[in-house]
Amino acid sequence: DADIATLMDFRVDQSRGLHFIYVLPYSDRHLLVESTMISNQLEDKNWYRNAISQWLADRSIQIQSQLREEYGVIPMSAAQPKNAQIANIGAAGGSVRLSSGYAFSTIQTQMAVLAEAISTGERKVPEPYSKRLIFMDKVFNRALSAQSDHSAKLFMATGKTLDADQFARFMLGSAGIMEWAKVI
């Protein structure tokens, strides 16, 4: 369905780490498909390609042509600034949410704040997440690592207590105390 994005489909091989498929349709004829795994090791690129092919085949989605292929690794640990004189943004500025890999909206916020600061002669980039959120993400990641056989179930259980808007806020790092209480 060209109107529905699939953010995390866990109905894929979970034997090597927390693995999901992300699908973003651009139209009824174009879509972005991503195989994502939260793990301590990288798999061969063909492993990810095969996961995508299998996911598409299971849904009877036929690809006539592939326009592009990308490959990347998102760090799931805190960034360590190398030079205090440089205003780091993105992954280098700590924008990657440690428990989810989400970064896009935080990078947008950092850019807006940095642009405003530069206009006043400053170059300080705000911390993207609170110390409490970073601590909770580290606890969550430890739980996922310790229970790697059950990580998909643990991840899904985290989200089942929240409605869609609450889950989005939780994943973006802007959840309130009530959402945190539901998750814990």
Where does each model-flagged region fall?
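FAD-binding beta-loop-beta segment adjacent to the flavin cofactor pocket
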Residues: D13-L18, Y71-I89, L98, A143-D163
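C-terminal helical "tail/cap" subdomain of flavin- and related membrane-associated enzymes
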Residues: A112-I184
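A conserved FAD-binding loop/helix module that cradles the flavin
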Residues: A92-L114
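Predominantly flavin-linked oxidoreductase catalytic cores and closely associated redox partners
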Residues: D1-S65, P75-K82
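Conserved aromatic-histidine-acidic binding/catalytic patches
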Residues: N40, D44, S99-Y102, A143
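Flavin-binding catalytic cores
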Residues: Q41-E70, A84-A87, Q108-K131
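Generic secondary-structure boundary/loop-capping signal
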Residues: I4-A5, D58, R68-Y71, G93, ...
